[in-house]
Amino acid sequence: MGSFANGQNGSELGIQTPATGSNAALEPPTTSAAAPRCPRLGMAMVAARAAALVMALLSVSLMVSAKQRGTLAIFGIEIPLYAKWSLSDSLQSLVGISAAAAAYSLAQLLSIAHTALKKAPVVPSRRYAWMLLAGDQVFAYAMLSAGSAAAAVANLNRTGVRHTALPNFCKPLPRFCDLSAASIACAFLGCAFLAASAVIDVIWLSRL
């Protein structure tokens, strides 16, 4: 140390010192924060999306199988009836939106499985979490809207039209009405599970 006091520089001793005013050697290397894994939250996300997929598939399969023939007696006249989901615009919309929601849920489950194989976080970034939140809300509202429209048609078939001679169509067509009601119930349950997925997305956003 006395060599520095005698005016000798550090290069003569084989020592290199940082330049004056530079903090490069004093600052620790910066690393980007990794996304949290949250295994319990990831399991809840998988369960909610799997349930939404099952409900959407059930809604489609039940509605597609809803068709029946029967006869209706009005003023003693036998009128042949044929009921099928494709004859109603509202029921067609329910089938289409439920199929789209099933495809969306399946795609998300496959994405989660892919990230699990790579041992990466289920939700790697805030941007991805925002995309999930937007998709979940869109399909939840779409299924709610389609289910409500289909429920109005099913209720009209079951109660008939008041102040007219049109009676309850579900009496001669019980199978069609029961399958339609079950399909609509599954659609509402699928909407609920998609809404639960949206809540889980919000929790992910709060932790990223």
UniProtKB/Swiss-Prot annotation:
Signal peptide: none annotated. Keywords: Cell membrane, Glycoprotein, Membrane, Transmembrane, Transmembrane helix. Residues 1-43, 114-128, 205-208 are cytoplasmic. It is found in: Cell membrane. The chain crosses the membrane at residues 44-64, 93-113, 129-149, 184-204. Its main location: membrane. Residues 65-92, 150-183 are extracellular. The keyword Lipoprotein does not apply. Residues 1-11, 17-33 have a biased composition (Polar residues). InterPro entries: CASP/CASPL, CASP_dom. Residues 1-33 are annotated as: Disordered. It is a multi-pass membrane protein. GO terms for cellular component: plasma membrane. It comes from the Eukaryota. Glycans are attached at residue 157. Belongs to the Casparian strip membrane proteins (CASP) family. PANTHER family: CASP-LIKE PROTEIN 3A1, CASP-LIKE PROTEIN 4A4. Homodimer and heterodimers. NCBIfam families: A_tha_TIGR01569. This is CASP-like protein 3A1. It comes from Hordeum vulgare subsp. vulgare. The lineage of its organism: Eukaryota, Viridiplantae, Streptophyta, Embryophyta, Tracheophyta.
